[in-house]
Amino acid sequence: MAATARRGWGAAAVAAGLRRRFCHMLKNPYTIKKQPLHQFVQRPLFPLPAAFYHPVRYMFIQTQDTPNPNSLKFIPGKPVLETRTMDFPTPAAAFRSPLARQLFRIEGVKSVFFGPDFITVTKENEELDWNLLKPDIYATIMDFFASGLPLVTEETPSGEAGSEEDDEVVAMIKELLDTRIRPTVQEDGGDVIYKGFEDGIVQLKLQGSCTSCPSSIITLKNGIQNMLQFYIPEVEGVEQVMDDESDEKEANSP
């Protein structure tokens, strides 16, 4: 009897203790929450050294081959010049663009061209391996866009827009170039700029990947010339013009 009574008293005491703890928890529910959950979420399981904490550059740059094996088209996934183009055939011409200057500092880069949403880089010769050049080009482009610097510091016209002084034939040539021909050439990483129209001959300047492309003459004759002659009977032919002596030497070299 005594043992049974003691067991009953013990059970009652335990039950009373549980009731007090339960009531205390109901009155103070936060006593069981020793640390907010978000502190566990934000706390790294394996703390890294301070040297590893740095801004991460989120940029995926695609590359696209061009008809010119020495030119490669880099697509950063964001606008470059949007609706126009700029050509930098030599390092001296790159004074207008901080990015072009940085790209020319990479050994083996011959010329740089900016399109609406791409950057065309041309290497000096076929012996240079793109696999050796591309890492430096990727890093230069990513660093520049992360810096927030302006792409160009001096505005220059990229082509010859139509004006009121143009006659009907010249206006038609420029419109056809802008709407049908230039977009196609830009897809290959280059551009074509109107320079003049005289005695039935349309004078054009090729830029970007088209400058030193082995098939540039074919592009002029079979592509651009045929289209211009089809729509504009006054056009008798197309010829490529050079802006400086270096271009002329390159065109005349074997």
Swiss-Prot record:
Residues annotated for [4Fe-4S] cluster binding in this entry: 210, 213
Transit peptide: 1-9
Name of the featured protein: NFU1 iron-sulfur cluster scaffold homolog, mitochondrial
Function per UniProt: Iron-sulfur cluster scaffold protein which can assemble [4Fe-4S] clusters and deliver them to target proteins.
Subcellular location: Mitochondrion; Cytoplasm, Cytosol
Transmembrane region(s): none
Subunit structure: Monomer and homohexamer; the apo-NFU1 is a monomer, while the holo-NFU1 is a hexamer composed of a trimer of dimer that is probably linked by some 4Fe-4S cluster. Interacts with HIRA and EPM2A/laforin. Interacts with BOLA3. Interacts with HSPA9.
Annotated InterPro entries: FSCA_dom_sf, Nfu/NifU_N, Nfu/NifU_N_sf, NIF_FeS_clus_asmbl_NifU_C
Annotated effect of mutating residue 182 to W: In MMDS1; patient's skin fibroblasts show deficiency of lipoic acid synthase and reduced lipoic acid content
SUPFAM superfamilies referenced in this protein's UniProt entry, alphabetically: Fe-S cluster assembly (FSCA) domain-like, Hypothetical protein SAV1430
Tissue note: Ubiquitous. Expression in adult lung is weak compared to fetal lung.
GO cellular component, one term: nucleus
SMART domains given in the database record: Nfu_N
Gene name of the encoded protein: NFU1
Keyword Transcription: no
UniProt keyword list: Cytoplasm, Disease variant, Hereditary spastic paraplegia, Iron, Iron-sulfur, Metal-binding, Mitochondrion, Neurodegeneration, Primary mitochondrial disease, Transit peptide
Highest taxon in the source lineage: Eukaryota
Alphabetized GO MF terms: 2 iron, 2 sulfur cluster binding; 4 iron, 4 sulfur cluster binding; iron ion binding
